[in-house]
């Protein structure tokens, strides 16, 4: 069984309020064993367009990645995030070991 990942590109519209999303999302990340591989950091756009922040979150498997996204805990956080940021958000399978 391969791991699964959230790949999220973020443009924050309200830097002052965005931390509300981060705080609200924490319980879902803990509950589902999320592991941050990339969280912000310096980057260079080599092709195409970019957003100001990039996040990669690893989950045990595809079912867990979707369960976290669909959980009441994360959906509450998502509502907050949508007020303060624009995102491109995908869930993708990793390469099998």
Model-derived features: positions:
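C-terminal structural segments of small proteins and small subunits
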Residues: 65-90
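Short S/T/G/P-rich N-terminal loop/turn motif that feeds into the first structured element of a domain
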Residues: 1-53, 60-70, 93-97
């Amino acid at each position: 069984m391969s791991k699964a990942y959230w790949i999220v590109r973020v443009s924050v519209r309200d830097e002052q309020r965005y931390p509300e999303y981060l705080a609200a999302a924490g319980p879902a990340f803990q509950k589902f064993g999320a592991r941050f591989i990339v969280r912000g950091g310096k980057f260079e756009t080599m092709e195409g367009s970019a957003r100001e922040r990039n996040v990669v979150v690893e989950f045990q498997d595809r079912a867990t990645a979707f369960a976290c996204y669909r959980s009441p805990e994360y959906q509450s956080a998502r509502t907050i995030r949508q007020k303060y940021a624009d995102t491109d958000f995908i869930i993708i399978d990793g390469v099998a070991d």
